[in-house]
């Protein structure tokens, strides 16, 4: 099975397109409801439980198999990434189509033009060099002489480069039966607090008991902003006064989380990079307090980066990697950029997995990152247009 066909079969089913659109519209209505009031968590929880009961009943009644349910979920994810990456997709596909139309033959001029295109898309110099070198070898190995025949290989190599370190590294280190501590770091203005609120909503929807710790005690309004999110999604927020010691906030939060049987504690931190040494000392102090009370914690240190800042996001990631052990990236505002290639640069040059991406403003627009979902969103039109109809209707073994 071709790579394009596999992605199309997984993420896009034309015969289900209308139903999928209705499902997404219904999801949007449901997830916008909390914006009307700050106290909607109980009704949300009941609704989600009813959804789960409904799905279980469908399984029991034989109306929907687990495989069918998983297929529908994959299509929903594909639609989310397709919608959220619309700007990047239009940019990538238009430039690649123009490139393939201009350069018909596979030669060094074509590869140099491809390098320039990818660098302009924020893929990152080192990653681009590796990707294009791989394509040169692939073209030689398969004796490809027409650039059009490299279209699928380009997309496939992007996935391979992302997954070459560890295909499973994008999974969160969350375990049942323990207090899981997530430390959020990042500069001000990239959507760190919003990400915390959406993460809390996501885990609460999965049946987890969630608590937030307002550890950004220096930025004016940061504590109040986190409290608004806590009220909106229906979770407790542990706080002290503005200017207080962030480590003391963490100490109080961990004790409260243990007393209340919390599954996941998400901790906000200050987002200042003016003085790297001060930031390092502050984060180390916070981590010491956490690890004394919860062995091996924090279990995740997530760095929030704004996709719209382009290569500046890469510089921020490098700076934070120097001051603390970042375990994953949350790339926010990916829907607001036409240069979605920064995902590859972060993964390949810093060896930090992207664990979540922000694909819009709704609560459920924070999605777990997956390399195949990402490239589908980035090249969906190209993928669907370049799967031959004969491949849809004939068995794969037929000549």
Where are these regions (language model features)?
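P-loop/Walker A NTP-binding module and the surrounding RecA-like catalytic core of P-loop NTPases
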Residues: 126, 155-399
